[in-house]
Regions:
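Extracellular adhesion/carbohydrate-binding repeat motifs centered on closely spaced tryptophans
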Residues: 1-144
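Glycine-rich, flexible loop segments associated with nucleotide phosphate handling
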Residues: 38-41, 174-177, 241-247
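N-terminal capping segments
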Residues: 140-199, 242
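...with weaker cross-activation on analogous glycine-rich loops/strands in unrelated enzymes
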Residues: 194-266
């Protein structure tokens, strides 16, 4: 009589388990503990008895778990599976969902509420704006997000990227009267922070972006580093608009506000022009 974990080669092959006392084939969940190699939780198909080697939903416990592709044993902790990171809770093996603290890495991360895969980059989740490190998944705080944005802006000084061209290639609207807003968009985009500019809207028209923030009560005369500075100059084309120019605030020293913008045929750093209104992205909300 066969007992223990056995491989059956017929019908494309499968691993099964026969009870070490009765010899009866196991179905459903089973905790094995008959030798050092086979100790832990396993799952066997309810009909065929085939050992699971993948994600399985355990209806009776209302949880998703993962069984190793080689051993079939239920897994716990962090695992890299099918090009993504997952976390299985230490006691139950249930896949983590939502915002989760990883003590081993001393970091907050976020697992998608549907797939349970770790999220990287910018994301709007439950109405809140987040940025997760592209490599580690660690959640950035407000200052880290602003530092990432302003560092990217400084890295573009005296460069000549085709900001309108990249914006157009990404499906954005182009303003034919200048690249200032396309440059602001390009800073956010190249830093991976697209969602922090009008929730990911793609338009090179300054007034589109200004109106978006103003309608949400996010515009004031008080500047902060990481803000978007807007002006309405006397351009004839902008007569009916509330903004015709934009730049990014990178320093605030008392009343001296420093911006980086695309002006005079170059990307430069300079003191803010008079009469600015400052839009405040949702860095911490």
């Amino acid at each position: 009589m066969a007992k223990g974990v056995k491989h059956i080669s017929s019908n494309n092959g499968k691993w099964v388990y026969y009870d070490v006392v009765t010899g009866k084939m196991a179905h459903g969940e089973a905790h094995l503990n008959y030798d050092k190699e086979h100790t832990g939780w396993y799952y066997f198909d309810q009909n065929t008895g085939k050992m699971a080697h993948d994600f399985v939903y355990l209806r009776q416990h209302d949880k998703w778990v993962y069984y190793d592709k080689i051993t079939g044993k239920m897994q716990y902790g962090e695992h890299y599976i099918n090009d993504g990171w997952y976390y299985m809770k230490p006691v139950t093996g249930a896949l983590a969902k939502g915002r989760t603290w990883l003590d081993a890495g001393k970091k907050w991360v976020y697992y998608d509420k549907t797939s349970s895969r770790m999220i990287h980059g910018g994301a709007i989740l439950d109405g809140h704006h987040y940025f997760f490190d592209p490599h580690t998944g660690a959640q950035y705080n407000k200052q880290q997000i602003i530092d990432r944005l302003t560092s990217q802006a400084r890295a573009l000084l005296n460069q000549h990227p085709d900001c309108p061209g990249v914006l157009a290639a990404n499906g954005g609207l182009i303003c034919p009267f200048g690249p200032c807003m396309a440059f602001v968009w390009y800073i956010f985009h190249s830093a991976g922070l697209d969602i922090f500019l009008c929730d990911g809207a793609k338009t090179g028209w300054p007034h589109h972006n200004y109106d978006w923030y103003r309608s949400r009560g996010r515009v004031s005369h008080t500047p902060h580093v990481g803000d978007i500075a807007f002006w309405k100059f006397g351009d004839a084309w902008a007569h009916d608009y509330d903004a015709s120019y934009a730049g990014v605030v990178v320093e605030v020293n008392g009343r001296n506000v420093i911006i980086i913008d695309a002006a005079y045929g170059d990307i430069g750093i300079r003191s803010a022009y008079n009469g600015a209104n400052y839009a405040h992205p949702y860095y911490d909300e």
